Amino acid sequence: MTKTDIATRVHNHTWKLDPIVRSLIDTDFYKLLMLQMIWKLYPEVDATFSLINRTKTVRLAEEIDEMELREQLDHARTLRLSKKENIWLAGNTFYGRSQIFEPEFLSWLSSYQLPEYELFKRDGQYELNFHGRWMDTTLWEIPALSIINELRSRSAMRSLGYFTLDVLYARAKAKMWEKVERLRELPGLRISDFGTRRRHSFLWQRWCVEALKEGIGPAFTGTSNVLLAMDSDLEAVGTNAHELPMVVAALAQTNEELAAAPYQVLKDWNRLYGGNLLIVLPDAFGTAAFLRNAPEWVADWTGFRPDSAPPIEGGEKIIEWWRKMGRDPRTKMLIFSDGLDVDAIVDTYRHFEGRVRMSFGWGTNLTNDFAGCAPKTIASLKPISIVCKVSDANGRPAVKLSDNPQKATGDPAEVERYLKFFGEEDHKEQKVLV
C-alpha cells in the first residue's frame, strides 16, 4: 500500500472536492451482513435513520459548513459498488466461510445507490435524516458519521500551517505507537479496528490500521472497515448491531411480540450465519432483561458483545449467566468494544485472562485520539459522541435503552414505555465520551 504524508495531504487542499467517503465499502463489515439479512427477510420495511449529537455543548452547525457537508453527502450518493469490490465480496472467505454473500444479493448491491437525505439546521445543530426502505437507508449510517467527523477535523486544522500540522501528526503517531508497545505486553491478545464511524480521517484510520498490523502482528485480527480489509489484506470483522432489535421491536403489534423481538432477531441471524458470527448483542433493551428471558438455545451461541455496561462488570454478569445455564465460560467468547482505550483493554484482559476467550474492538480512541498533540489547544480535535440511529420503522418510533441511560435514544414517551416493559435492572449512568 502506498504510504501518504498526511500532513502534506491535509495542508495542500487545492482541489475542488476531496472525497471523505471513497467507496460504498468504506463502511463497517457488519452493515453488509445486516443488509443482506434485511434485504432477504425485511425487504418491505421502511426505516428512518437520524443523526444524534450526544455532545450537546458542540454546535456542529457552527463548526461545519453546510455547503461542504452537502457536497460530501452528494458525492457519497454517486458511489457504486465497483467490479473489483463485487468480485472480492463474492470470492473472499469471511469468518471461515466462502460465499457468505448470496449472488442475488451482490447483484442487487451492484446497482445500489444511497438514497436522498434531509438536512436542515436547528439551534446550532444539524438535523440529518434518511427516509426510505430499511434496506436502502441502513447503509447511510457509517458514511454520514465519518463525513461529519472528518469535516469537523478539517475545519479544526484549516488555519494550521504545514509545520504545525507536521508536529500534530508526528505527536499523534508517537502517542499511537506508545499504545502499540503496551499492547505487546498482553500474550494472546486479539484486537481489531472498530474506528470507522468516528475517525479523524480516512487517511489516519488507514495509518492506524497499518501501524497495528506491523506493531502487534497476529494479535491484530482485522478491521471492521471493508475497504481497508480489502486493500490491506486483512480480515473484515464484525457481527450485528442494535438496529436489528430496535426495528423488530418497533414493528411489534403486541406485548408478546415486543418481548420476543430480541430473540426473533437472533433466530433470523441464525438462518443466514453461524459459527463465529453467532455473537449476541444483549443490551438494546437492557442486558438484565435480555438474560432474564433468554431461551436455552442462546447459551449455545459462540459469545456475547457487552456494549454499554462497564466491561468488567458486564463481562462478569454474562459469565455468571453462562454458568447458570450449565455452559463453560472458557469455551465462550466475550467481545469488548465500548469506548475502549489501552488502560481499559489492559485491565479487562488481565481480569478475564484464562477465564473466557476475549476479543477487543478498538474504536474512537484508536482512530481519533489527538488529545495533547496540537502545539496549541484545538477543542474541535477532541472527538464527540455522535451516532446515527433508527428513529422509526414503518412510521412507528424506534427505541434503544442500553445499560447506560445516557445512551438511550427514541421518543421520550416510547422510551418510558419500554423502560416500564423491560425494567431498569442494572441500568447505570455513565458519562458518554465517545
UniProtKB/Swiss-Prot annotation:
GO biological process: one example: NAD biosynthetic process via the salvage pathway
Pfam families: NAPRTase (PF04095), NAPRTase_N (PF17767)
Sequence positions bearing Phosphohistidine: 242
Pathway given in the UniProt record: Cofactor biosynthesis; NAD(+) biosynthesis; nicotinate D-ribonucleotide from nicotinate: step 1/1
GO molecular function: nicotinate phosphoribosyltransferase activity
UniProt-listed InterPro entries: N/Namide_PRibTrfase, NAPRTase_N, Nic_PRibTrfase, Nic_PRibTrfase-Fam, Nicotinate_pribotase-like_C
Transmembrane segments: none
Catalytic activity annotation: nicotinate + 5-phospho-alpha-D-ribose 1-diphosphate + ATP + H2O = nicotinate beta-D-ribonucleotide + ADP + phosphate + diphosphate
UniProt modification remark: Transiently phosphorylated on a His residue during the reaction cycle. Phosphorylation strongly increases the affinity for substrates and increases the rate of nicotinate D-ribonucleotide production. Dephosphorylation regenerates the low-affinity form of the enzyme, leading to product release.
Keywords, in A-Z order: Ligase, Phosphoprotein, Pyridine nucleotide biosynthesis
Keyword Metal-binding: no
Protein EC: 6.3.4.21
SUPFAM superfamilies assigned: Nicotinate/Quinolinate PRTase C-terminal domain-like, Nicotinate/Quinolinate PRTase N-terminal domain-like
Recorded GO CC terms: cytosol
Keyword Phosphoprotein: yes
Superkingdom as given in the UniProt entry: Bacteria
HAMAP family, alphabetized: NAPRTase
Function, in words: Catalyzes the synthesis of beta-nicotinate D-ribonucleotide from nicotinate and 5-phospho-D-ribose 1-phosphate at the expense of ATP.
Protein family according to the UniProt entry: Belongs to the NAPRTase family.
Protein's name in the database: Nicotinate phosphoribosyltransferase
Organism expressing this protein natively: Agrobacterium fabrum (strain C58 / ATCC 33970) (Agrobacterium tumefaciens (strain C58))
Gene name of this polypeptide: pncB
